[in-house]
Design a protein with these regions (language model features):
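Beta-strand-rich, repetitive solenoid scaffolds
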Residues: 43-44, 56-57, 78-79, 88
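C-terminal interaction-tip segments
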Residues: 1-21, 32, 78-90
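Solvent-exposed serine/threonine-rich low-complexity stretches and specific carbohydrate-binding patches
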Residues: 51-59
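Exposed aromatic-hydrophobic patches
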Residues: 61-69
Length: 90
C-alpha cells in the first residue's frame, strides 16, 4: 500500500531518484534484465557516491517491500543492465 506522502519513479538506466535525504520504501522489478543485472542504491547524487545502501538483483521480476532504508545525501540508482524498475520513496 502506498501512502499519500510517497513518491514513485520508474527507470531503466542510472537515475537520481531524490537529491536530498529520503527513505527508500519499496522496489518493484517490472521487467527483468539478463544475467547478473543489478541496481545499487547509493547514498548520494551520482554513481561514485558511497556507500551502497542496498542492492537489488534484477535477473527476475519481483517486489521488495518494507525496505525503509534512510539515505542522508540523496538516493541514486546505479543500474547495471536493462531491467525496468519502479521505486517508491519518501
Amino acid at each position: 500500500m502506498v501512502e499519500l506522502n510517497h513518491n514513485v519513479v520508474s527507470f531503466k538506466s542510472d537515475t537520481l531518484i531524490k537529491g536530498n535525504h529520503g527513505v527508500l520504501v519499496a522496489v518493484f522489478v517490472t521487467k527483468k534484465g539478463s544475467g547478473s543485472n543489478k541496481v545499487e542504491f547509493r547514498n548520494g547524487i551520482n554513481a561514485s557516491a558511497t556507500p551502497v545502501e542496498c542492492t537489488i538483483f534484477t535477473a527476475i521480476e519481483g517486489n521488495y517491500q518494507n525496505i525503509h532504508s534512510r539515505f542522508e545525501n540523496g538516493i541514486f540508482a546505479d543500474c547495471d543492465g536493462a531491467a525496468e524498475v519502479t521505486v517508491v520513496f519518501k
